[in-house]
Amino acid sequence: GTHAANVACNPKGGYDPVKDFTPISNLARTPNVLVMNMDVPAQNFEDLKTYIGRKAPGAVRYATGGTCGVHHLTGALFSSLIGAQLTHVPYRGSGPALTDLMGGQLELFFDSMPGSIQAIQSKRARPVAVAWPTRLATLPEVPTYAELGLGAINDGVWYGLVAPANLPRDIQTKLNAVTKKVMS
């Protein structure tokens, strides 16, 4: 998640995500999703690529819930992989970004699935692709990025628990065991 992705945007950010922390546990993973405004004249990925191709470079905007997080980097990678110049519009959280997408102020939004699922199910946002190894049971008609030839994007967000660097191994092991117990 942001812990690791932030370094790509801010290499002098003051920490090394590998050297400065001791991993304790992976807490959860969630799929990412690309959704579009319902007014975008596209029904699927190919239509969206055509739509973007007809616009001036930078005219199509994509929102994320912030700067330098995994969704921002996903949007930049998506833009690069399809050979288009999209404009990133960072928000202070996913909620305001989704509201503006549904309100027509933006064309695209890169988000985690839990944040956008209600908008998708209520037909207030149209899903384009999911970042996950397989199609989702909740959205079986939505292809994965890998199916669209964009396999570099095909992973979700992970939420992990870390401690300061050089944590003694016995404490790391205990924290991992307690975390597993609490999470089960």
Residue ranges and their predicted role:
Residues 8-96, 145, 158-184:
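Hinge/capping helix and adjacent helix->loop/strand transition within the periplasmic-binding protein
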Residues 5, 69-73, 97, 108, ...:
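Short, electropositive, low-hydrophobicity segments enriched in small/polar residues
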Residues 52-55, 76-81, 95-105, 109, ...:
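Short helices/loops that flank or line small-molecule/ion binding pockets
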Residues 7, 97-100, 137-141:
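Short, charged, surface-exposed secondary-structure boundary motifs
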Residues 1-2, 94, 111-116, 131-133, ...:
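Beta->alpha turn/N-cap motifs
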